[in-house]
Each structure stands twice: as C-alpha cells, then as structure tokens.
Amino acid sequence: MRILKSHPLLKLVNSYLIDASQPSNISYLWNFGSLLLLCLIIQIITGVTLAMHYSPNVLEAFNSIEHIMRDVNNGWLVRYLHSNTASAFFFLVYLHIGRGMYYGSYRAPRTLVWAIGTVILIVMIVTAFLGYVLPYGQMSLWGATVITNLVSAIPWIGQDIVEFIWGGFSVNNATLNRFFALHYLLPFILVALVLMHLIALHDTAGSSNPLGISGNYDRITFAPYYLFKDLITIFIFIFVLSSFVFFMSNVLGDSENYIMANPMQTPAAIVPEWYLLPFYAILRSIPNKLLGVIAMFAAILAIMLLPITDLGRSKGLQFRPLSKFAFWVFVVNFLILMKLGACHVETPFIELGQLSTALYFGHFIIIVPIISLIENTLVDLNTMSKG
C-alpha cells in the first residue's frame, strides 16, 4: 500500500480511484462517469484496430469495410462493437447531462467542470460525424455533403471554407483522408479533456449529491465502496451492449449506408445517426440557412447558460416542484425533437419542429429564470407568514 502513496504516478491513481472521499449518499445516477470512461476505452481500442485494416480512399473505403467484416479475424465483432458503443456513449452522455441538470451540477463551485463537459460534448459530436463519413456508403457521402455545406452559410467566405474542408469542389479523396486523420486524432484529445474534467471536479468540491447540500458531513472512500458500485453498472452495461452487438447489430444504423456511395443518386432522406437528430431537427426547423446553423450550434452551447439563468436558492430540483415539472417537459421536448429529426420535411413536422425549437431555447432563456424567481418568492412568502 505504501508504494501507492509514494510513487509519483501511482499516487495520482490512489488519490482519484482509491482514497478519493465521496459523499456517502450518492446514488447510481453518479455511475455514468465510469461507464463513459469504459466506452471511451472500448472506442479507442476498437478504433485503432479498425484503422489497421481501413483504407481512406474513395475507391477502396467501402470495400475495406467489407474486408474487415468478411476476412479479418473477428473483424465483424470489432466493427459492431465500435458502432454500437458509439451509440451507448451518446446515450450515457445525455443521461449524464440530464442528471447534472436535475441535480444542479452546473452551479458553483462546479461551473468549470460543466464548461469542460460541454466542450467534451462538442468534440464527441464532431468525432461521431467524422466517423460516420468513413464507411463511405450512401448516407456517409450525402451526410458529409449536407453537413459540410452548412459552413457555406457564413457570409462572403463560406463557400471558400467549404472547398477548403473538402480539398476540392465536392466530397472526394482528400476529404476522406482528412476526415480519417481527424477521426483518429480527436479521441486522444477527448482523453485529455476527460482528464481535465476529472481534475476540475477533484480539485474544486468533488462529487455533488442527491440532496444538493455539502457532502462534507459524511464521506467515504472511493474504494472499495463506490468501486464495487461502479462494477455493478459496468457488468449491466456490458450485458446490454453485448445484446446489441450480437443480436441487434444494425438496429441503430441506417440501411442506406450498406449501399456504396454514389454521387449521382441522392437517398430518399438524408438523416444523421439517432444521437444527433435533435440538433438536426433544430437546424431544419429554421428556414434561413445561416440562422439555422447558428441555432444548431446555440442548441449545444445552451447548456452553458444554466449557471447564469438558474437563480434558485437551493441546488438541484429535488425540492422545487415547478422546476422539476419544467425539467421533465424539457426532456419530453428533447425526445420529440429526436423523433422529428428523422421525419421528412413536410407539414405538420415543420411546424412541430419550430414549436419544439422555441420551447428548447425558451427553457434555458425564459422558463428556468422565471420559475426559479417564482419559487424564491413563494419560499419568502412562506417564511414571512410563519415569521
């Protein structure tokens, strides 16, 4: 045990994973961190393995994926692990963010942790988009064309930037090469950001807790208590992920991507992966191209407003019934946006998308501050009546 506290590197591991004191009342909703770390490890291992057999060339990319599936030993397993863990990664990240919103994890002194987490989400979205292009099926090509074309909405220089990204006048060999290089690089940047996220959490106030009060009254060490608690959810996660990988490998994908990319034939509907659909729905709900792009990016950055707009006196929504109701309305609205992102651009989906987009932004800018002020006033009135 002594070496864990004296060795310069093991000392860090000890302070984060063994002796780190945690509030004694944190629930299973605080287990997402370990699950997300497991997802990142799986993604890097499977991604590097896939990169050994992948060819970033427009003529060979699709066939190299088929080669991985058919000829490489357990290549099908590595590929399906990579694609399904990507979905699991985003699913858990959304739950992690939702838990943070519900329990007020964005409030001081954890604002820096929240800000770094938002940057992690942005890097994840970019990485996922780049990875979706690499198989070079129909949805890969047209998804890349549509999303990169959004940059052309920037006044004056937009089209030049798009051609710079493409390395030509359309998605071509240069595009695929640079997307592959960036997709390989970004997960390692993600690792650095995750370490920053952990350091910011560890060096401020540590984990919050379901009551929203100081956790200093009763704390226990991370090992063995929370280590074993994390292992329970890790085993459940492995079981669920395995059921997807082995029995429902393509249920979260798009069948269009099993058709080789054809620049001469547009798919019936161009949709991204399910985890990017809410932001895609926001993009499509605004007719103006530039405003749509701004709204899409603003939708991701909107969670950064919470430390400013939440004016409530108590941390978290556990004892704030109005805020709790508003939060669940927001969750349902987010799921509606996800569904609308996969629908065709036609009535009534356009109007529903516009309403949902207005409600999405309204939650952060109007609903959260107004409800928190109403709750503060009700608490004050109750205190005065009792006084």
From Swiss-Prot:
Chief location of this protein within or outside the cell: mitochondrion
Pfam families: Cytochrom_B_C, Cytochrome_B
Residue ranges of the TM segments: 32-52, 76-98, 113-133, 179-199, 226-246, 290-310, 322-342, 349-369
Residues binding a ubiquinone, per UniProt: H202
Biological processes, Gene Ontology terms: mitochondrial electron transport, ubiquinol to cytochrome c
Single GO molecular function: metal ion binding
Residues that bind heme b b566: H96, H197
Localization (cell): Mitochondrion inner membrane
SUPFAM superfamilies per the UniProt record, alphabetical: a domain/subunit of cytochrome bc1 complex (Ubiquinol-cytochrome c reductase), Transmembrane di-heme cytochromes
Subunit: Fungal cytochrome b-c1 complex contains 10 subunits; 3 respiratory subunits, 2 core proteins and 5 low-molecular weight proteins. Cytochrome b-c1 complex is a homodimer.
Miscellaneous remark of the record: Heme 1 (or BL or b562) is low-potential and absorbs at about 562 nm, and heme 2 (or BH or b566) is high-potential and absorbs at about 566 nm.
Job description of the protein: Component of the ubiquinol-cytochrome c reductase complex (complex III or cytochrome b-c1 complex) that is part of the mitochondrial respiratory chain. The b-c1 complex mediates electron transfer from ubiquinol to cytochrome c. Contributes to the generation of a proton gradient across the mitochondrial membrane that is then used for ATP synthesis.
Full protein name: Cytochrome b
Organism: Podospora anserina (strain S / ATCC MYA-4624 / DSM 980 / FGSC 10383) (Pleurage anserina)
Lineage, opening ranks: Eukaryota, Fungi, Dikarya, Ascomycota, Pezizomycotina
Underlying gene: COB
